[in-house]
């Protein structure tokens, strides 16, 4: 019997595994492909806040950015490379958002590095920019290191049954708790109010004689040069899904688009693409992550008829699956949010610490129930 079974071995699942093992718990981790085999493995894994004027997501990402930079540096220093991050506005609206951000942020800002400024295009130099200390994660390595100590099973979870106070997985394994960290792929438990946006990501590694000193974000993300290699990545095709789209993804066209966008920001010389990484990321429809217990929709519709249409529903009145939670929907901020959200989820499961309503999956049940 395991204390927790985690379904999905991307950065979310591996972060939860790490938190549970830190508490001395027995962990089993499932993934049909392998550790960091999907969107997490394809990620550029840039650690960045959200540069916007205001909003719940901006505030959440600010807290997660501060927490995760410290978390990676302390716990996985060999996977974390500190680097200056320079974010450049795309248009006039972005210019204004960055000006407001710079006035209000509590983060320590830096001047744009001189050796970076020399590489920027005329168009990029005209736009507002912001620079601060951030970092880049070795995506696959940190997922492997985080999950070290967990029992890993390369298997698709198709059957999940609650029986005698525990969950039975694929009729073979049992666990007291189950955490669904399935990303953009189908969950073994189907609930109509849980809808995931699948977001295709593409990253390329290139060789170039251009030496980039910083992480640079504008139309795409560019990593600092490392032994002549520079990574370029983006949330590239929001409609493509490898299991649901008939046509295969056009890698060559993806490369062309990434390089075209990158060269709008920076002069890149003698470019040669040496490797491609692709994978699905998952987002929610209100852009905030989903962390917490899953509502049993049919049972809740029957028992909470009178309270389904109130302006501010009380999530505590809903009926939930026993010992079943999820962590999902981080979009392009997976490596920023995962350590922070995994800690929140673990404290909820093991110590009954309340989860903020803004990220609780029950918010989607409340909206769905009203629209039925």
Regions inferred by a protein language model and the residue ranges of each:
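A conserved short coil-to-beta-strand element within the FAD-binding core of flavoproteins
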Residues: 153-167
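Dinucleotide-binding Rossmann-like beta1-alpha1 core, especially the glycine-rich loop
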Residues: 45-128
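Glycine-rich FAD pyrophosphate-binding loop
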Residues: 22-41
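N-terminal Rossmann-like FAD-binding beta1-loop-alpha1 element of flavoenzymes
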Residues: 2-28
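C-terminal catalytic lobe of FAD-dependent flavoproteins
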Residues: 271-372
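Central helical "cap/lid" subdomain
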Residues: 175-217, 247-254, 268-270
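Short beta-strand to alpha-helix junction loop
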Residues: 55-67, 92-93, 128-145, 249-253, ...
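Core beta-strand elements of the Rossmann-like FAD/NAD(P) dinucleotide-binding domain
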Residues: 2, 170-177
């Amino acid at each position: 019997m395991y204390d927790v079974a985690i379904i999905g071995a991307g950065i979310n699942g591996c972060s939860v595994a790490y938190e549970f093992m830190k508490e001395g718990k027995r962990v089993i981790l499932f993934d049909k492909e392998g550790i960091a085999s999907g969107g997490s493995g394809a990620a550029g894994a840039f650690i960045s806040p959200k540069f916007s004027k205001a909003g719940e997501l901006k505030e959440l990402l600010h807290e997660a950015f501060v927490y995760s930079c410290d978390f990676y540096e302390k716990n996985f220093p060999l996977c974390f490379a500190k680097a200056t991050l320079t974010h450049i506005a795309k248009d006039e609206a972005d210019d204004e958002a960055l000006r407001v951000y710079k006035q209000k942020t509590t983060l320590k800002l830096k001047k744009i590095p001189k050796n970076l400024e020399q590489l920027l295009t005329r168009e990029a130099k005209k736009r507002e920019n912001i620079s601060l200390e951030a970092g880049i994660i070795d995506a696959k390595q940190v997922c492997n290191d985080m999950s070290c100590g967990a029992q890993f099973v390369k298997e698709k979870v198709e059957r999940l049954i609650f029986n005698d106070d525990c969950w039975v997985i694929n009729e073979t394994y049992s666990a007291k708790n189950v955490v669904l960290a399935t990303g953009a792929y189908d969950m073994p438990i189907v609930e109509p109010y849980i809808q995931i946006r699948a977001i295709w990501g593409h990253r390329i590694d290139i060789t170039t004689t251009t030496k980039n000193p910083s992480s640079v974000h504008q139309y795409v993300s560019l990593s600092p040069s490392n032994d002549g290699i520079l990574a370029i990545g983006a949330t590239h095709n929001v409609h493509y899904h490898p299991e649901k789209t008939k046509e295969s993804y056009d890698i060559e066209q993806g490369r062309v688009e990434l390089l075209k966008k990158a060269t709008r920001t920076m002069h890149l010389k003698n470019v040669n693409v040496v490797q491609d990484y692709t994978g699905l990321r998952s987002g929610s429809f209100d852009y905030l992550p989903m962390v917490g217990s899953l509502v049993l929709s049919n049972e809740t519709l029957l028992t909470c008829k009178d309270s389904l249409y109130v302006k501010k529903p009380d999530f505590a009145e809903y009926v939930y699956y026993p010992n079943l939670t999820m962590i999902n929907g981080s979009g392009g901020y997976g490596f920023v949010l995962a350590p922070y959200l995994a800690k929140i989820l673990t404290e909820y499961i093991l110590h009954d610490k309340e989860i903020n309503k803004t990220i609780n999956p029950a918010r989607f049940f409340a909206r769905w129930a009203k629209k039925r």
